[in-house]
Amino acid sequence: MSKPDVSKLNRGNIVEFIGGIFDRRGDEEYLGEPVTMAEHMLQGATIAEQNGQPEEIIVGALLHDIGHFTSEFGMFSMDDTEDRYHEEAGAEVLEQFFPSVITDCVRYHVAAKRYLCATKPEYFNRLSEASIHSLKLQGGPMDAEEVAEFEKNPNLKQIIAVRYLDEAGKRADMETPDYWHFAPMVQRMVDKHMGA
């Protein structure tokens, strides 16, 4: 199965394109966690669905780490001289197709970890060893100025919800449906943003 031309992505094929990423690349290791990339994202979405969360939270959890696959979107080059932050890369790709609440959940899920560690010290105890390591690389807990700025985001509640799902989606033995179970919901979010 070959990758489609990203310049031809539109509301009619973006959902299938993302599904292809899950199918082709989902078995990749998830940063030292006991789950694959697909399992991680599917677990977050499944937990959200089981808890009756709104579709925007479910889809935000499902797609929050899609930026790890920047090569699928033509955004990676061997000439790159700096990190392409996966959260920003993912949001950049999705923002033309999805409402801002979803792209904010993607763009700020790393910042939300830093925020929660600064404002709810007990949150740190939820973090896995790999997540603690990445927290250090991401700048550690936010300072007071960063917290105040972050709290201005109108989608703060949803971003925080996805962050909790991000941390919860690391269970080695959890059964989940596949991406295609969520695909109709993903399409509804695309249609909501782009006009049905």
From Swiss-Prot:
Gene3D superfamilies: Hypothetical protein af1432. Fe cation 2 binds at residues 65, 86, 109. Binds 2 iron ions per subunit. During catalysis, TmpB uses a mixed-valent Fe(2+)/Fe(3+) cofactor. It is an enzyme of class 1 (oxidoreductase). GO terms for molecular function: metal ion binding; oxidoreductase activity. Its EC number is 1.13.11.90. [(1R)-1-hydroxy-2-(trimethylamino)ethyl]phosphonate binds at residues 30, 68, 86, 109, 113, 131, 134, 163. Its cofactor is Fe cation. Fe cation 1 binds at residues 30, 40, 64-65, 166. InterPro entries: HD/PDEase_dom, HD_domain, OP_Dioxygenase. Residues 37-156 form the HD domain. Keywords: Iron, Metal-binding, Oxidoreductase. Pfam families: HD (PF01966). It catalyses: [(1R)-1-hydroxy-2-(trimethylamino)ethyl]phosphonate + O2 = glycine betaine + phosphate + 2 H(+). PANTHER family: HD DOMAIN-CONTAINING PROTEIN (PTHR40202:SF1), PTHR40202. Involved in the degradation of the naturally occurring organophosphonate 2-(trimethylammonio)ethylphosphonate (TMAEP). Catalyzes the O(2)-dependent cleavage of (R)-1-hydroxy-2-(trimethylammonio)ethylphosphonate (OH-TMAEP) to yield glycine betaine and phosphate. Is highly specific for its N-trimethylated substrate. This is [1-hydroxy-2-(trimethylamino)ethyl]phosphonate dioxygenase (glycine-betaine-forming). It comes from Leisingera caerulea.
